[in-house]
Amino acid sequence: MSKLFWAMLSFITRLPVPRRWSQGLDFEHYSRGIITFPLIGLLLGAISGLVFMVLQAWCGAPLAALFSVLVLVLMTGGFHLDGLADTCDGVFSARSRDRMLEIMRDSRLGTHGGLALIFVVLAKILVLSELALRGESILASLAAACAVSRGTAALLMYRHRYAREEGLGNVFIGKIDGRQTCVTLGLAAIFAAVLLPGMHGVAAMVVTMVAIFILGQLLKRTLGGQTGDTLGAAIELGELVFLLALL
């Protein structure tokens, strides 16, 4: 289990992980690491939340929110934001399915992708600032949001097919079973309930699950399946939906 955690941490983040900690784990077995996604999200959100706490007293909530979001982006290498941008460029191009998938592979940023990035990043900053003004714990909110968003991404993997012939997303999409999905969602729910007591966190997770499930069905209808880019988009949108549900 520890090897899986470290392998997943190095796979979906840019945090330094000694190679020997994940040595001996075959790439084909990475799908089992889905159950570590909520824990990795918890770690990322906690670090980002700590940055907010340290900076809030010095520069106020808006700037603290800006830097906490920036730290979160740096820790993931913009991996998920890139997926969000590519997904929006492809889906909103209104082309054929094959052409959409080609556009999503294009490394150039299009108008729809750029607008999506601006909207999501600004929305996160504004929501975090508002939550802070309402006296909510940003550390707990971010930790729960990142855990839940990565946990609910399993909804785009279970019983979905990969829309391309090959790619990184193929490691997970269609490769996880019902038990792994339930364990992943269960861990995310536990983190949300512990960090945000009074059913506030669980209610926000339910809203997030519904939103991500609907997103998955829409993408399945549009693209014929899921890709690594759509998983990244689901994680970014899941974070935002969860935070919005806390308002």
UniProtKB/Swiss-Prot annotation:
Induction: By cobinamide. The keyword Magnesium applies. The chain crosses the membrane at residues 34-54, 59-79, 113-133, 138-158, 194-214. The keyword Hydrolase does not apply. Its EC number is 2.7.8.26. InterPro entries: CobS. GO terms for molecular function: adenosylcobinamide-GDP ribazoletransferase activity; cobalamin 5'-phosphate synthase activity. Its main location: membrane. It is an enzyme of class 2 (transferase). GO terms for biological process: cobalamin biosynthetic process. It is a multi-pass membrane protein. PANTHER family: ADENOSYLCOBINAMIDE-GDP RIBAZOLETRANSFERASE. Belongs to the CobS family. HAMAP family: CobS. This is Adenosylcobinamide-GDP ribazoletransferase. It comes from Escherichia coli (strain K12). The lineage of its organism: Bacteria, Pseudomonadati, Pseudomonadota, Gammaproteobacteria, Enterobacterales.
